[in-house]
């Protein structure tokens, strides 16, 4: 048995970076690889010198260390990385073993352990070598103080930005110190400072002073904000097929406004929301000697004139589906998009044609459209034809839509013959997004509202006013938990029954995005086995989510709702359940199992959980 022992007696070897017996300096971004790099260089030379020697049998390595550093050592220790090679000579093997204690010290230091005890044992049995590396990392260094200082005008011009930068620095007193966390904290704080006004901000100096005796880290970072940047002229590259005026019309930036990365992101989003551009890249000049009216460079890659898209999918409510669309982007030679689209699933068949104008001033888009939908659910069939015009605008936080639509619907049911209704409806729709992350929100809210009316005799069978609203609130609980609340209200206000109102403008409840535990659109006015749409709707959800890691979580929820023609005769349908949550690359995917407390049934649900 050959043993190699390195402990506190050899602390001077693993603290060669120390400036005094008690303290070691680790300037920002300085790699802690001095001894490790030298060892690796020697190893390469040693391997090159002995490549002509006879091959030796492979050896096995067992690393006995706490979980917090075991993976780090298995991944980066040379003796572990070369274990499967069969061309390691005896001298090379001895060098690997000898270098292991210093490599362990270098690696554990990056994880905040500066006084490890390392023991390396080699045993040979039946011609096979077994290497055991035992590591006691000792106490992990923790952050004792954090000193962030700022140079430049940020302190007087924008104290809120300085405060936001301090908040973005993620290492706090009492937190474990690691090299990766130290780098992440500096990077996050710098990006926050650069996000508004101070595009040219930089880290003037940074230092992590480590006291290996007390296992305390004193952190200091000095930021230089540099001057305030303002937005200049937007120039566009890559325009070949479509007018450059499209970029001008959707551009939300004004020359001279203070630089804000969210405004730059909004410009990119506005361009990508148009049908013309496959990709958009934006670069803003960051020359601190010319901060005023800094140029904004936009590079676009255009879609061809003809586009065909298609896809297949599955949803619990509607079953498997297939969908597709064809778009010609240069109708009349004037960049007017003409689109034909359709979707088929088990309960609904849908088709639409739409002709739009290019975005006009301030990004408003005008279009004319016609659609036809055939829906067969809950023993009720609705045939709905629509034609109309609309004017829409999509903003960073708020979307607007104004439309004038003509509806003609036919309703087939079990208890009576078909009924036909029509209406000419001026409508308004408004959506506001105020969340921290548009794809995976943890805080904030989403609100959508609609309003419309129709007057009898004006291509309308029955006078009515229609309103609908839906809201979703996200409330974070600690770092891993989350409450989600959802509410939905709808009403068609008219005298008498709703037989003259187009059925597609009425309401039913039930399903994955409504009241779980009940079938899709199975809550409504039940007549002879048919569930008819109703005048009033109310649903609500309270959901609690716990996330085990960044991507996976679990949920428990309570849903309740009703759909009725007479509010005084309403019946509420509650449901409870549990589910799994996955933050997939395409968006949040929810898998739920719900129990309907009124119908005593269990139903599974699979949904792509994007709100709206």
Residue positions per predicted region:
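C-terminal outer-membrane beta-barrel translocator/porin domains of Gram-negative envelope proteins
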Residues: 273, 307, 412, 416-419, ...
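N-terminal signal peptide c-region/cleavage motif recognized by signal peptidases
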Residues: 52-54
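N-terminal secretory signal peptides that target proteins for export/translocation
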Residues: 1-35
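Bacterial N-terminal signal peptides
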Residues: 40-50
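Periplasmic polypeptide-binding modules associated with outer-membrane biogenesis and secretion
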Residues: 57-70, 81-316, 325, 339-357, ...
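C-terminal structured "cap/appendage" subdomains that terminate the fold
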Residues: 561, 567-587, 598
């Amino acid at each position: 048995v050959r043993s190699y022992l390195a402990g506190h007696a050899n602390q001077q070897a693993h603290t060669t970076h120390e400036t005094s017996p008690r303290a070691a300096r680790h300037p920002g971004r300085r790699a802690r690889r001095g001894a490790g790099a030298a060892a690796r260089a020697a190893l390469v030379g040693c391997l090159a010198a002995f490549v002509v020697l006879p091959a030796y049998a492979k050896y096995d390595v067992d690393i006995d260390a706490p979980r917090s550093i075991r993976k780090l050592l298995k991944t980066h220790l040379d003796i572990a990385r070369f274990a499967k090679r069969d061309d390691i000579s005896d001298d090379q093997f001895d060098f690997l073993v000898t270098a292991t204690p210093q490599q362990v010290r270098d690696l554990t230091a990056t994880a905040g352990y500066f006084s490890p005890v390392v023991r390396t044992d080699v045993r040979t049995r039946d011609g096979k070598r077994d290497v055991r590396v035992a590591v006691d990392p000792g106490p992990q260094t923790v952050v004792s103080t954090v000193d962030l200082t700022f140079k430049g005008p940020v302190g007087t011009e924008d104290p809120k930005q300085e405060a936001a930068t301090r908040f973005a620095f993620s290492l706090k007193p009492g937190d474990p110190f690691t090299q990766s966390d130290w780098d992440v904290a500096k990077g996050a704080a710098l990006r926050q400072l650069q996000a508004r006004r101070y595009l040219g901000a930089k880290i003037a100096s940074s230092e992590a002073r480590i006291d290996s005796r007390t296992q305390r880290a004193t952190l200091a970072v000095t930021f230089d904000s540099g001057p305030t940047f303002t937005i200049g002229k937007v120039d566009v590259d890559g325009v070949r097929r479509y007018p450059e005026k499209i970029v001008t019309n959707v551009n939300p930036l004004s020359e001279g406004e203070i630089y804000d990365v969210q405004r730059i992101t909004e410009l990119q989003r506005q361009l990508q929301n148009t049908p013309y551009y496959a990709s958009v890249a934006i670069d803003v000049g960051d020359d601190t000697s010319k901060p005023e009216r800094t140029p904004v460079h936009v590079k676009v890659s255009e879609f061809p004139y003809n586009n065909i898209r298609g896809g297949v999918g599955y949803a619990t409510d509607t079953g498997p589906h297939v969908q597709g669309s064809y778009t010609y982007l240069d109708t009349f030679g004037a960049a007017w998009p003409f689109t034909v689209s359709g979707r088929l699933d088990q309960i609904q068949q849908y088709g639409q044609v739409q002709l739009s104008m290019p975005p006009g001033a301030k990004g408003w888009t005008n279009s004319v459209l016609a659609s036809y939908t055939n829906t067969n659910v809950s023993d009720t069939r609705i045939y709905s034809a629509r034609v109309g015009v609309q004017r829409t605008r999509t903003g960073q936080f708020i979307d607007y839509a104004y439309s004038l639509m003509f509806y003609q619907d036919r309703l087939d049911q079990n208890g009576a013959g078909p009924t036909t209704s029509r209406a000419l409806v001026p409508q308004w729709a408004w959506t506001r997004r105020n969340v921290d992350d548009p794809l995976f929100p943890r805080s904030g809210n989403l609100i959508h509202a609609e309003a419309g009316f129709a007057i009898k005799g004006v291509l309308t069978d029955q006078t009515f006013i229609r309103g609908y609203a839906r809201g979703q609130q996200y409330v974070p609980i600690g770092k891993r938990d989350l409450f989600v609340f959802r509410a939905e209200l709808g009403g068609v206000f008219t005298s008498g029954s709703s037989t003259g109102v187009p059925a597609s403008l009425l309401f039913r409840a039930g399903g994955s995005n409504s009241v779980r535990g009940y079938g899709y659109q199975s809550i409504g006015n039940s007549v002879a086995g048919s569930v008819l749409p109703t005048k009033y709707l109310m649903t609500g959800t309270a959901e609690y989510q716990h996330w085990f890691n960044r991507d996976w979580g679990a949920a428990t929820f309570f849903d309740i709702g009703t759909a009725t023609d007479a509010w005084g005769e309403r019946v509420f349908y509650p449901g409870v359940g549990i589910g799994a949550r996955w933050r997939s690359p395409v968006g949040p995917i929810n898998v739920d199992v719900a129990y309907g407390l009124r119908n005593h049934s269990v139903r599974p649900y699979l949904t792509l959980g994007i709100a709206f």
